[in-house]
A protein has these predicted regions:
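Membrane-helix interfacial "entry" motifs
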Residues: 21-26, 69, 73, 77, ...
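Specific transmembrane helices
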Residues: 29-116, 134-146
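Membrane-embedded catalytic scaffold of the fatty acid hydroxylase/desaturase
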Residues: 87-99, 110-111, 120-295
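Short, strongly hydrophobic alpha-helical membrane anchors
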Residues: 1-23
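Short, charged cytosolic
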Residues: 2-6, 50-70, 151-167
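Peri-membrane helix termini and adjoining interfacial loops of integral membrane proteins
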Residues: 4-11, 108-117, 164
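Coil-to-alpha-helix initiation sites in intrinsically disordered, low-complexity, charged segments
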Residues: 5, 13, 59-67, 73, ...
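A membrane-cytosol interface segment of integral membrane proteins
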Residues: 217, 292-340
């Protein structure tokens, strides 16, 4: 029987990887980024209301009901988000997928291979200017890896079956960002580790190994700023567009909401996380001219399969098995909307 100390350690671990996330200043679901997202949404809703009515008066109760409607936050889809968040946090910690392959392991392997070939790492420059440049480089590298992994999740049928769990959300709250099949999360981590490991290793070989990027609360400065500056509104019902010019540089919450649209004209658009110029290169950029009414989810014929925890975890595996073992190459599965 475990000692009290061991039990307390286990309890602390469970807390840290579940509810503790909300108190981790480096996590996008921590209280500070959520509060900033609330402030932005509150201002936007009040401003639009004032433009519509011509009155500067703020109806606090009405505004709060608009920001936190029961029909969204207590929707069955949202409840599944909350459940899958807790289950995944524990499951992914248990398999420790992030330590199986990390950017550090990949970059160190590249450096060791370079040493075998007789290549020497250049001496490091720890000046602030280089640290800023390196931070920008790492942020671009991370965003590129996240974007191309996201692109593959939509274009490769087997990966789409896993990623479909995320897109099956019928309403969106900030927790929807954590609505992922564990294998989907594993693939994303693998792509990021490979890409960033190669990029970090290449930088170390050329400009020096000891350059440290700038961090804020344990997160890369650029990514932390992005998370605080409204990231949580990407998965929400609040439409915020940056305008045509800035939408071509940064992915706005509205653009990501379009990405989640079940309308066919919005399929496979806006794969970027921070920057939208990756989508310009891929030919997948969609910049809404005006506010659009967006219905979230996947095809109505498939949606019922993803309205339970069992469906969210088991259905993708079953469909992948049928694709690989039971269905002839190229043949669509029953209920497949063709969104691959």
């Amino acid at each position: 029987m475990p000692s009290n100390s061991a039990f307390e350690d286990q309890l602390a671990t469970v807390w840290n990887i579940t509810l503790g996330v909300f108190f981790d200043p480096g996590h996008f679901l921590s209280l500070f980024p959520l509060f900033i997202a609330f402030c932005i949404a509150f201002f936007v809703v009040c401003h639009r209301r004032q433009q519509k009515t011509g009155s500067a008066e703020v109806n606090l109760r009405r505004t709060m009901l608009l920001l936190f409607p029961r029909r969204i936050f207590l929707h069955n889809s949202a409840k599944l988000d909350y459940a899958i968040f807790f289950i995944n946090q524990i499951a992914l910690f248990a398999i420790a997928f992030s330590t199986v392959l990390s950017p550090a392991i990949v970059s160190n392997s590249i450096l060791e291979f370079g040493a075998v070939l007789g290549l020497q790492t250049a001496s490091a420059d720890t000046s602030l200017a280089l640290r800023i440049l390196y931070t920008v480089y790492i942020v671009l590298l991370w965003d590129f890896s996240a974007t191309y992994a996201h692109y593959l999740k939509h274009k490769v049928p087997v990966l789409w079956e896993l990623h479909k769990v995320h897109h099956s959300a019928e309403v969106m709250t900030p927790v929807t960002a954590m609505r992922r099949h564990p294998l989907d999360a594993l693939f994303g981590a693998f792509c990021t580790s490979i890409t960033m490991g190669v990029g970090i290793g290449a930088w170390a070989m050329i400009l020096g190994q000891d350059v440290m990027p700038i961090h804020v609360f344990g997160s890369l400065a650029g990514i932390w700023i992005w998370r605080v500056a409204g990231y949580n509104l990407r998965h929400s019902h609040v439409w915020i567009s940056y305008g045509d010019f800035w939408n071509r540089i940064f992915i706005s919450p509205a653009q990501h909401q379009v990405h989640h649209s079940k309308s066919q004209e919005h399929y496979d658009k806006n794969f970027g996380h921070i920057f939208s110029f990756w989508d310009s290169l891929l030919g997948t950029l969609y910049c809404p001219k005006n506010a659009e009414r967006v219905r979230f989810g996947i095809g109505d014929d498939e949606l019922p399969e993803y309205r339970s925890l069992t469906g969210l975890y088991i259905t993708p595996v079953g469909k992948i098995w049928r694709r690989l073992a039971g269905s002839p190459a190229g043949e669509k599965l029953q209920g497949d909307t063709g969104r691959t």
